[in-house]
Amino acid sequence: MGKKAILLLLSAVVLLASCANPQQRDNSLQCEKQTIDLPGVHNARQLGGYVIGDKKIRMDLLLRSGTLAKASDEAISALHDKYKLALVADFRSSMERSKAPDRDVEDAINVWLPVLEKKISGEKVDTVMAALHFNMDNPSYTVELLRQQNIQDALSTSYDAIVFDEDCRQSFADFLDSLVALPEGRAALWHCSHGKDRSGWGTAFLLAALGADRSLIVDDFSISNIPYTNEIEDLASIAREEGLEDELIEYIYLLRGVSAAFFEKTLDAIDSCYGSIDNFLEQELDLTADEKQILQDKFLE
């Protein structure tokens, strides 16, 4: 979706008054501090309160999560009433959306910005990634897959695929454009299926645009392991029982949670190719200095 289309869509939601929720003052980068109460929505949290330089991210405006498909009525009401949600950015594939469509939130637009569409459900589907993606509920089969070199290769480069694929970059560029166009005082929520990898990279690019340092970007990305601790530990336990080598356990984090190690490798690749993540934002996501300033003025205090 182009910048003009996003601007036209978002202009339709500016009719309601912006909310003025009390600002909570807490700097701690802890899962429980960032978690928001959205029953039925996995890994729901906000960026509000993060310290960037001598400023903080405003509370209750920037939300990230898993799919809204099973969001409760209470969650939908909170998104409308408390957060004054204006935008939902959905990074899932067409197949994921058709199997589990988001619930609608009144007065919010839902923008489809697919990341890894071709690899998961497109015409050039990557059978390796598809096998992993759609067999998440079969632990023994998953462990067997992890023994295969092609699976290991696909997993070890999965973050690179998210960042360096042209279509994925366009979706992230449109995501940042949508935040530039977001009405003042209104919230945005972005998600994929589980709110960890694709949502995590979208968050990383946003945090970088807001001026966050690398440690904050990595810490926020890593928080996604906490809501999925049980799933990670359960699969790791089964894997060890079935004799999976210790060095392959890291791949379980890529499947059930996130891998900070592989995340940082891709950040290193960005630095190597572009000099810095700021240069990547400018050269590949077409984020101008003026747009970056708009984001900082809008979301920092």
Feature map (PLM): residue ranges:
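Positively charged n-region of N-terminal signal peptides that target proteins for export
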Residues: 1-5
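Sec-dependent N-terminal signal peptides
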Residues: 6-12
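Detector for intrinsically disordered, low-structure N-terminal pre-sequences
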Residues: 12-13, 124
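C-terminal motif of bacterial Sec signal peptides marking the signal peptidase cleavage site
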Residues: 14-18
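Cys-dependent protein tyrosine phosphatase-like superfamily
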Residues: 19-189, 201-301
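Ser/Thr-glycine-rich phosphate-binding loops at phosphate-binding pockets of nucleotides
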Residues: 194-199
